[in-house]
Amino acid sequence: MQLHYVFSHLQNSFRARKSLASVPNCNSVLELCAVLYHQGFLSSIQRGDIHGPDALPTITTRQNVATRRLWLGLKYFEGKPVLHYIRAVSKPSRKVNLTPSELLQFAKGRKVSFVNGLEPAEVGIVETKHGIMSIDDAIKNNLGGNVICRVK
């Protein structure tokens, strides 16, 4: 699963105090990064190639799709990473699908089935039929889905 690669790559990039991180350019990764950006964990998202962000916008075609990357600006506060950790909740061997009411309990910090609830200042990210979104947006829209990860 490509998202698990992104989780570990982001954590390693933050720990190495990098200013930019490069991740594969695909729709699911872009949606995940957009949620992280809106939640304040990333400072920017840019498209580019394997050498760096594009200076001028470049269209992705069949000829260049293998070299296209997303370049993420990593955010720090007083020299410390804003993102402390990003952990997978659903795994290929164990999917965690929750209903809207179970998502609400999970967001309140209560244990749902075999998954511990969110801690204070932790953000849950959910894959719904409308795409990847934060747990707050899923609850507002009364959507259930697959809990992908938790971020703090």
Curated annotation (Swiss-Prot):
InterPro entries: Ribosomal_uS8 (IPR000630), Ribosomal_uS8_sf (IPR035987). GO terms for cellular component: mitochondrial small ribosomal subunit; mitochondrion. The keyword Amino-acid biosynthesis does not apply. GO terms for molecular function: structural constituent of ribosome. SUPFAM superfamilies: Ribosomal protein S8 (SSF56047). The keyword Ribosomal protein applies. Pfam families: Ribosomal_S8. GO terms for biological process: mitochondrial translation. It is found in: Mitochondrion. It comes from the Eukaryota. Keywords: Mitochondrion, Ribonucleoprotein, Ribosomal protein. Gene3D superfamilies: 3.30.1370.30, 3.30.1490.10. Signal peptide: none annotated. Component of the mitochondrial ribosome (mitoribosome), a dedicated translation machinery responsible for the synthesis of mitochondrial genome-encoded proteins, including at least some of the essential transmembrane subunits of the mitochondrial respiratory chain. The mitoribosomes are attached to the mitochondrial inner membrane and translation products are cotranslationally integrated into the membrane. Component of the mitochondrial small ribosomal subunit (mt-SSU). Mature yeast 74S mitochondrial ribosomes consist of a small (37S) and a large (54S) subunit. The 37S small subunit contains a 15S ribosomal RNA (15S mt-rRNA) and at least 32 different proteins. The 54S large subunit contains a 21S rRNA (21S mt-rRNA) and at least 45 different proteins. Belongs to the universal ribosomal protein uS8 family. This is Small ribosomal subunit protein uS8m. The lineage of its organism: Eukaryota, Fungi, Dikarya, Ascomycota, Taphrinomycotina.
